[in-house]
Design a protein with these regions (language model features):
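Sec-dependent N-terminal signal peptides
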Residues: 4-14
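Non-catalytic cap/lid and distal C-terminal segments of serine-dependent acyl enzymes
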Residues: 21-226
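Sec/Tat signal peptide C-region and signal peptidase I cleavage site
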Residues: 16-20
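Accessory, usually C-terminal, subdomains that scaffold auxiliary metal cofactors
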Residues: 14-15, 226
């Protein structure tokens, strides 16, 4: 059997098994070239939704943390399929499609390296403002990937081609947590015409002292907060 055909069959079997374990909806898996690597992308259809002109697409960072617990290094995930299942039980059916992008920490799907994830999601524009020293040199030498650019130039065109649609700020958003939340904010700042909203949960605010986290809830809100 041709190796490519065998791989595709194996991927289909795995995806079917995964879908059987979801509380709601279905998933399709794809791999997109990212430099010398391939990045796993999962397209999640809540309630098996079809796509139309009113569908909102949401890119979610750290795709391995969104569904089944076995995909996560810590054995706990968001289980967004259960959240959508809860909405379905109260007759709520959001017209959305989730684009789950696997993080760089799951290197080649074999082991976890959180340093790679941190460096990829770290806003590269900040490096030039760091004080001169070892930290600036290390970040400058290792932070060689541009995650927002990868999303806009690789992931978004792939999704547009698959669904034969145009994505922009009117139908595309991005969500992440911790460093993924910081990256989501950075992405919408860099590409305001591409993304219409960003969800930043438990954001990892780099550059502040640990005790300053305690003051964040009572500080002045960012313009636009409700």
């Amino acid at each position: 059997m041709n190796k490519s055909v065998g791989f595709i069959l194996l991927l289909l079997m795995f995806t079917n098994t995964m879908n059987a374990e979801l509380a709601n909806g279905k998933i399709e898996e794809f791999f997109i070239k990212n430099g010398i690597e391939e990045r796993k992308i999962r397209i999640y259809y809540p309630n098996n939704n079809s796509v139309d002109d009113d569908t909102t697409f949401i890119i979610m960072n750290d795709g391995e943390e969104l569904f089944l617990e076995r995909d996560s290094w810590r054995g706990r995930t968001w289980r967004i399929d259960k959240s959508f299942d809860g909405l379905a039980k109260i007759n709520k059916d959001p017209n959305v499609i989730i684009i789950a992008v696997q993080s760089a920490k799951k290197y080649k799907g074999k082991f976890f390296d959180n340093t790679r994830r941190y460096l990829e999601l770290f806003p590269k524009e900040v490096i030039e403002f760091l004080p001169e020293g070892n930290k600036k040199k290390i970040y400058g030498s290792l932070a060689d990937t541009d995650y927002p650019k990868f999303l806009v130039e690789s992931v978004v065109p792939f999704v547009e081609g698959k669904f034969e649609i145009n994505l922009d700020k009117n139908n595309l958003g991005i969500i992440g947590s911790s460093m993924g939340g910081l990256s989501a904010l950075n992405t919408i700042i860099e590409y305001p015409d591409e993304f219409g909203f960003a969800g930043c949960l438990s954001t990892h605010w780099i550059g502040i002292k640990p005790w300053e986290y305690l003051l964040l809830p009572i500080r002045q809100r960012i313009s636009g907060d409700q």
